[in-house]
Amino acid sequence: MKRTYQPSKLVRKRRHGFRTRSETVGGRRVLANRRSKGRKKLSA
């Protein structure tokens, strides 16, 4: 059986990266929430 998690740095960056998050309203909301929580890492 094939495993569901097949790591790829490029796909990770494209889907969950900072630039991608910044593009959409929802993504910006995610960043804002993580900033207010004081997360060291905002995105992948």
Swiss-Prot record:
Pfam families: Ribosomal_L34. GO terms for cellular component: ribonucleoprotein complex; ribosome. Signal peptide: none annotated. Keywords: Ribonucleoprotein, Ribosomal protein. It comes from Gluconobacter oxydans (strain 621H) (Gluconobacter suboxydans). This is Large ribosomal subunit protein bL34. One of its GO terms (molecular function) is structural constituent of ribosome. Residues 10-19, 31-44 have a biased composition (Basic residues). Belongs to the bacterial ribosomal protein bL34 family. The keyword Ribonucleoprotein applies. Residues 1-44 are annotated as: Disordered. Gene3D superfamilies: 1.10.287.3980.
